[in-house]
Amino acid sequence: MLEEDMEVAIKMVVVGNGAVGKSSMIQRYCKGIFTKDYKKTIGVDFLERQIQVNDEDVRLMLWDTAGQEEFDAITKAYYRGAQACVLVFSTTDRESFEAVSSWREKVVAEVGDIPTVLVQNKIDLLDDSCIKNEEAEALAKRLKLRFYRTSVKEDLNVNEVFKYLAEKYLQKLKQQIAEDPELTHSSSNKIGVFNTSGGSHSGQNSGTLNGGDVINLRPNKQRTKKNRNPFSSCSIP
């Protein structure tokens, strides 16, 4: 475990073509709501949720990035400092599936190889699917990514996506702290680890934690109860 007065915060970016359900996904996860009306994200939206993972307090900061090319310059700036990524395509949108590799390259170009999952959303619309199951599975295998099929509308496997990424990042963080204990004792707190024993702090990314931008945050020391998702995972290792 990390030290008692330390809080973990993870910046996750959710990327993919427009209209694949990125905004709906983080709305569902953070607020428990689903809105079927599509509104194009202009630039970047942000939501957060605090959870517990293996008895550790973890704050997830979810950045929903626009899927249109005209916002590329804006959204790329928000990739910086990301520690995990959700790559999303839609069951009913062939173009979004074919664009996955391009989105992956954009993220890697900005932040390197961070914990990432591939998500096929809208599986409640399988009757209208434009992608064969074996195609999606082959893409996940080629990119060497964990693969989830989700339905934001039915709240299927949404929690599992973010829980998996949080667990993967915690593993990485603990390994880094084991190699360099000073990560938890530096005078400037980092996105990734916060000292919550004082007042409000600023979170600054370190080179080892992918970034160099500063984001002001107010750590929350309240512990949350573990959430149980009634759906079983349909992920592919």
Curated annotation (Swiss-Prot):
<dbReference type="GO" id="GO:0030054">
    <property type="term" value="C:cell junction"/>
</dbReference>
<keyword id="KW-0963">Cytoplasm</keyword>
<keyword id="KW-0217">Developmental protein</keyword>
<feature type="region of interest" description="Disordered">
    <location>
        <begin position="188"/>
        <end position="237"/>
    </location>
</feature>
<keyword id="KW-0342">GTP-binding</keyword>
<dbReference type="InterPro" id="IPR001806">
    <property type="entry name" value="Small_GTPase"/>
</dbReference>
<dbReference type="GO" id="GO:0003924">
    <property type="term" value="F:GTPase activity"/>
</dbReference>
<feature type="binding site">
    <location>
        <position position="23"/>
    </location>
    <ligand>
        <name>GTP</name>
    </ligand>
</feature>
<feature type="binding site">
    <location>
        <position position="23"/>
    </location>
    <ligand>
        <name>Mg(2+)</name>
    </ligand>
</feature>
<dbReference type="GO" id="GO:0005829">
    <property type="term" value="C:cytosol"/>
</dbReference>
<keyword id="KW-0488">Methylation</keyword>
<dbReference type="GO" id="GO:0000045">
    <property type="term" value="P:autophagosome assembly"/>
</dbReference>
<dbReference type="GO" id="GO:0012505">
    <property type="term" value="C:endomembrane system"/>
</dbReference>
<keyword id="KW-0479">Metal-binding</keyword>
<dbReference type="GO" id="GO:0006968">
    <property type="term" value="P:cellular defense response"/>
</dbReference>
<comment type="subunit">
    <text>Interacts with SUFU.</text>
</comment>
<feature type="binding site">
    <location>
        <position position="124"/>
    </location>
    <ligand>
        <name>GTP</name>
    </ligand>
</feature>
<dbReference type="InterPro" id="IPR050227">
    <property type="entry name" value="Rab"/>
</dbReference>
<keyword id="KW-0636">Prenylation</keyword>
<keyword id="KW-0967">Endosome</keyword>
<dbReference type="GO" id="GO:0006886">
    <property type="term" value="P:intracellular protein transport"/>
</dbReference>
<feature type="propeptide" description="Removed in mature form">
    <location>
        <begin position="235"/>
        <end position="237"/>
    </location>
</feature>
<dbReference type="GO" id="GO:0010008">
    <property type="term" value="C:endosome membrane"/>
</dbReference>
<keyword id="KW-0653">Protein transport</keyword>
<feature type="compositionally biased region" description="Polar residues">
    <location>
        <begin position="188"/>
        <end position="208"/>
    </location>
</feature>
<feature type="binding site">
    <location>
        <position position="24"/>
    </location>
    <ligand>
        <name>GTP</name>
    </ligand>
</feature>
<keyword id="KW-0968">Cytoplasmic vesicle</keyword>
<feature type="binding site">
    <location>
        <position position="67"/>
    </location>
    <ligand>
        <name>GTP</name>
    </ligand>
</feature>
<dbReference type="GO" id="GO:0005886">
    <property type="term" value="C:plasma membrane"/>
</dbReference>
<feature type="binding site">
    <location>
        <position position="21"/>
    </location>
    <ligand>
        <name>GTP</name>
    </ligand>
</feature>
<dbReference type="GO" id="GO:0045335">
    <property type="term" value="C:phagocytic vesicle"/>
</dbReference>
<dbReference type="GO" id="GO:0046039">
    <property type="term" value="P:GTP metabolic process"/>
</dbReference>
<dbReference type="InterPro" id="IPR005225">
    <property type="entry name" value="Small_GTP-bd"/>
</dbReference>
<dbReference type="GO" id="GO:0005737">
    <property type="term" value="C:cytoplasm"/>
</dbReference>
<dbReference type="GO" id="GO:0005776">
    <property type="term" value="C:autophagosome"/>
</dbReference>
<dbReference type="InterPro" id="IPR034114">
    <property type="entry name" value="Rab23"/>
</dbReference>
<feature type="binding site">
    <location>
        <position position="20"/>
    </location>
    <ligand>
        <name>GTP</name>
    </ligand>
</feature>
<feature type="binding site">
    <location>
        <position position="38"/>
    </location>
    <ligand>
        <name>GTP</name>
    </ligand>
</feature>
<feature type="short sequence motif" description="Switch 1">
    <location>
        <begin position="28"/>
        <end position="46"/>
    </location>
</feature>
<dbReference type="GO" id="GO:0060271">
    <property type="term" value="P:cilium assembly"/>
</dbReference>
<feature type="binding site">
    <location>
        <position position="121"/>
    </location>
    <ligand>
        <name>GTP</name>
    </ligand>
</feature>
<feature type="modified residue" description="Cysteine methyl ester">
    <location>
        <position position="234"/>
    </location>
</feature>
